[in-house]
Amino acid sequence: MLRVAVLSLHTSPLVQPGVGDGGGMNVYVRELVSALAHAGVDCTTYTRTWRDDLPAEVMIEPNHKVVHIPAGAIDMPKGDMISIVPHFTEGVLDHVNAHGGTDVIHANYWLSGLSGHSLKHELDVPLVSTFHTFARVKAEGGDPESEFREQSETEVIG
């Protein structure tokens, strides 16, 4: 059975859309992973622990579970999460290694892309990245992001 590690560092597919950073990406990740799970793909979505009362793992449906990785303060703003990417990455790596590995990584958003880029080299598996937004495109629309983000996206794309 194909095993996919789905990365969604800054927002969980369990978050209600419209709450905090919950929105289209949450719905996208949850629905994509659900479709893969129904097709017989073993999917684990890794997200940052976003509430104190969350279990370490939540089984959503057969072949689809969410794993909460403790990384940073519960109420950490998305703009500060670059600092926790290494800690999140280490937590994902530990879980993946403890549970038999993965065949492919699918990262969502640029922060998860940075984590996935490190993990693909550590685990020697392919990385698929869905950025959802790009710094370069946002800048063209008058909403500039950091130069670091743009450089990071370029590195992940390779």
Label for each model-derived stretch:
Residues 4-5, 120-140, 149-150:
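Active-site proximal beta-strand in glycosyltransferases
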Residues 64-97, 145:
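A short, charged, and often flexible helix/loop element on the N-terminal side
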Residues 1-58, 62-66:
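N-terminal subdomain of nucleotide-sugar transferases
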Residues 95-112, 116, 125-128:
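Short N-terminal targeting/anchoring amphipathic segment
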Residues 147-158:
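Membrane-proximal helix-turn-helix segments that form the acceptor-binding/catalytic region
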